Regions:
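An amphipathic, hydrophobic-aromatic interaction surface with interspersed Lys/Arg
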Residues: 1-272
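Short acidic DE-rich linear segments
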Residues: 272-289
Length: 289
């Protein structure tokens, strides 16, 4: 079976092809969110991008954020609902959120050089999804004697080994540069009502730690819904559990269930109409004149 792919525009007007988010991914995300397992949720988001992004490119955190938004739009829903404590529902278009982030993106890469050791290091936005501020996560590339390595394209063990070989003097310069760029630009992402007639602005920072809660909010759903959809598709529609988990998307599951509900309603309405048609007049003397 050939997987359906769709294009996603990321930073610097680049394009990547992605496969759809399946029920197995969505269910696992809901489990991690419900258990508040932030560390493993970050790891799983990274694994989902690695699996579903067909085009292999050097991706920073913003690219990955945009890809996750696209997966949410295509495979789940293009609408984000925010419910406030005062029970006000705000409806937002995820496509508009993604567009706003891309329009306000600006390259933030800076270079640290050491002519003594012939080393050049590029630092900038973090390249992994994280709920913690990991300083060395902001090192993009290291070039030593003309050989350049992109750290986000190698394993953690290889990164640690390369970083351990850097002279202490340049390591200090790198840390200094990273700390100077700690405060990233903030943009107004959207406005929402938190009480009747009262609005607030939600700001987006180009820093993975500050936006992790937003990412969780965008993907949050009721885990019971996932189990309910699974039950209906498997027991009522006779779709195998494997096919449901690994070949169907959340939005496809809901469409199938809605179709089933419509058919059941039509059958019930037809039965009621038939019963009403076949009803005999009640025996009696009739109405008085």
């Amino acid at each position: 079976m050939i997987d359906y792919t769709f294009p996603v525009i990321i930073t610097n007007s680049r394009e990547v092809l992605c496969k759809e988010l399946k029920n197995v991914h969505y269910k696992n995300i809901q489990k991690l969110i419900q258990n508040n397992d932030n560390e493993n949720l970050c790891i799983y988001f990274e694994a989902v991008i690695e699996e579903l992004c067909v085009t292999k490119q050097s991706l920073n955190y913003i690219d990955k954020f945009i890809i996750l938004l696209a997966l949410r739009m295509v495979s789940v829903s293009g609408v984000l609902e925010i419910h406030t404590k005062s029970e006000i529902k705000n409806t937002l278009e995820i496509g508009v959120i993604s567009k706003t982030i891309l329009e306000n993106f600006f390259p933030n890469t800076k270079t640290v050089r050491s002519d003594e050791y012939n080393i050049k290091v590029d630092v900038g936005y973090p390249y992994t999804i994280s709920n913690k501020n990991v300083l060395f996560d902001k090192i993009h590339t290291i070039e030593i004697d003309g050989t350049k390595v992109a750290l986000n394209l190698i394993s953690q063990e290889e990164r640690d080994e390369i970083l351990s070989l850097l002279p202490a003097s340049i390591s200090k310069d790198i840390l200094k540069e990273i700390k100077q760029t700690k405060e990233y630009k903030q943009i107004k992402l959207f406005t929402y009502f938190y009480e009747e007639g009262k609005k607030a602005d939600y700001y987006f920072s180009f820093d993975s730690t500050k936006n992790f809660d937003l990412l969780k909010m965008i993907f949050s759903d009721n885990l019971k819904n996932c189990y309910y959809y699974e039950y209906v598709c498997v027991s009522k529609l006779h779709i195998s559990l494997y096919d449901y988990l690994y070949y169907m998307t959340p939005v496809e599951s809901i469409l199938q269930i809605k179709t089933l509900s419509k058919e059941i309603k039509e059958q019930n309405d037809a039965q009621k109409a038939a019963q009403n048609t076949n009803k005999q007049p009640t025996p009696g003397l009739g109405a008085p004149r």
